[in-house]
Amino acid sequence: MKTVRESTTLYNFLGSHNPYWRLTESSDVLRFSTTETTEPDRTLQLSAEQAARIREMTVITSSLMMSLTVDESDLSVHLVGRKINKREWAGNASAWHDTPAVARDLSHGLSFAEQVVSEAHSAIVILDSRGNIQRFNRLCEDYTGLKEHDVIGQSVFKLFMSRREAAASRRNNRVFFRSGNAYEVELWIPTCKGQRLFLFRNKFVHSGSGKNEIFLICSGTDITEERRAQERLRILANTDSITGLPNRNAMQDLIDHAINHADNNKVGVVYLDLDNFKKVNDAYGHLFGDQLLRDVSLAILSCLEHDQVLARPGGDEFLVLASNTSQSALEAMASRILTRLRLPFRIGLIEVYTSCSVGIALSPEHGSDSTAIIRHADTAMYTAKEGGRGQFCVFTPEMNQRVFEYLWLDTNLRKALENDQLVIHYQPKITWRGEVRSLEALVRWQSPERGLIPPLDFISYAEESGLIVPLGRWVILDVVRQVAKWRDKGINLRVAVNISARQLADQTIFTALKQVLQELNFEYCPIDVELTESCLIENDELALSVIQQFSQLGAQVHLDDFGTGYSSLSQLARFPIDAIKLDQVFVRDIHKQPVSQSLVRAIVAVAQALNLQVIAEGVESAKEDAFLTKNGINERQGFLFAKPMPAVAFERWYKRYLKRA
């Protein structure tokens, strides 16, 4: 009878035997409606304690019994429900003894939750405080081959962990249950697909009904393939694609690790740069060059100890890391590598030689991190290359001066081009008759910081950096303008300018030269060009094209520094050259070594046979001049006649010279 009475009271007050209830976070008023979709039409004021009990409900459907005051009568009800969002709790109410209604509401709510857990795309395991399995969803079954009803109540530690892992996990589990904080963990789990890596996002929840128990909900995502993809990307990011060796990034990490764990032992870095690799690459193509890099890497590896690491930071450079080493050991290694790389490499039917230059640096004396020690090994390598290639150098602090000088030149030579700090000096050439018909233009740098800088101090850097191209173009055009000024004063002379190998590819110079000749009303080209023998060797086809284009403009072509480089009679016959310049080393030794006199006579004889003019440079004494004139030299230049001088100074010198003549 009590059940009927309570149910009738509930119906009379709320209009339903099983009304829908709702409680918000901001109010302790319990709102009722006949169904979930209708607006609340009845309310009951709860005590703070009653409201707090309802707010303890979680997202998992649960029930609690509560005594409510309805129409001044006490009514015991079952509230079945859950937390439906961040700020609301809702469910159904039934009279305390209406067991079928309570069971129906619980079944409805729990069946929904069960379906969500079962069909989720995560492996969901619910554990109690002892680590026993309470839920084991379908994805867990698929991965493990175990059924939920077989594992319920069993220890997760025994089923899926080794003894050592289980002991550690039990300790951690007790700590986590005490703190109640959510956490994430990555675990390797044995599955039907082998060992798989799962990321578990773990959260603690209260049972919400009956005995207040705490459960751990573990939601796991299989991240095995994601981690493998990340590892592949990591390997790609740290591996040279051509040789398979570690790249610069990887090597820097390895060097830093070696230095940090050196324990007072020395760590060495050896920097290798292949000589003439670019020429091989240009001649035979990139596929050939790539194969050569692979073969070279194998050759270098054959010279290393088992614990030494080879890397390719890029281009034609290699790095070797040696831990627990010494300077003598690194020098011995460098010698082995140099000896091996002097042997030819055969790729297909082609045999090539590629030596290398080697720099050595050690930690701690040359640097305490990878950046410093690599930089110093690089500096030592460039010192070895400048010293003649095919050798090694150990870094010394004095070598840094080269780096500082390079940086100073890199900054200030660019400013010099922009701010008109370059000037041209002219040195006259005297014919065997004593006439001045031509000059040589020699560039100088009037630095505000260092004063007048000779070309030997900056031309090599200009060639290395590529600044020689705009610098050379400026020289040619400025010389033409100066010759035009002299022409207007009645001084008609030709001027020779030097062209380097880097300038040969600058086809814009011909257009610019044509344009300035037209602007200044020249009917002829007053410019002669001086090419070194190395220009002809490095790219003979391009050199031939350049010579022909200058010749078409009316310029004469002189072969500079003849006899000091790669001279051959075939070059003199092939290239349309107008004159050869006898290098000053022959002139200087004329009266010191009899063989020099014979060489000069032979060179003059060959030139005359080919109808070429011969110009001697570096003439400093009357005795030298007499020998050269007697043996058929057409023009001479040197300090005996005049030093290089600015254009204004040359005009004064020229007027005095004409008066003496």
UniProtKB/Swiss-Prot annotation:
Key word Hydrolase present: yes
Stimuli inducing this protein: Constitutively expressed at both 28 and 37 degrees Celsius, during transition into stationary phase, more highly expressed on plates than in liquid medium. Expression is RpoS dependent and repressed by H-NS.
Reaction(s) catalysed (UniProt annotation): 3',3'-c-di-GMP + H2O = 5'-phosphoguanylyl(3'->5')guanosine + H(+)
One GO MF term: GTP binding
One Pfam match: EAL
Root EC class: hydrolase
EC number: 3.1.4.52
Domain EAL: start-end pairs: 406-658
InterPro entries: Biofilm_reg_signaling, EAL_dom, EAL_sf, GGDEF_dom, Nucleotide_cyclase, PAS, PAS-like_dom_sf, Rev_trsase/Diguanyl_cyclase
Keywords annotated in UniProt: c-di-GMP, Hydrolase
GO biological process: post-transcriptional regulation of gene expression
Ranges annotated as spanning the membrane: none
Deleted gene: phenotype: Leads to overproduction of curli fimbrae and autoaggregation in cultures grown at 28 degrees Celsius.
Annotated GGDEF domain residues: 265-397
Record-annotated PAS domain positions: 109-179
Task of the protein: Part of a signaling cascade that regulates curli biosynthesis. The cascade is composed of two cyclic-di-GMP (c-di-GMP) control modules, in which c-di-GMP controlled by the DgcE/PdeH pair (module I) regulates the activity of the DgcM/PdeR pair (module II), which in turn regulates activity of the transcription factor MlrA and expression of the master biofilm regulator csgD. PdeR acts as a trigger enzyme that connects modules I and II. It inhibits DgcM and MlrA by direct interaction. Inhibition is relieved when PdeR binds and degrades c-di-GMP generated by module I.
Assembly and binders: Interacts with DgcM and MlrA.
Name of the protein described by the UniProt record: Cyclic di-GMP phosphodiesterase PdeR
UniProt organism field: Escherichia coli (strain K12)
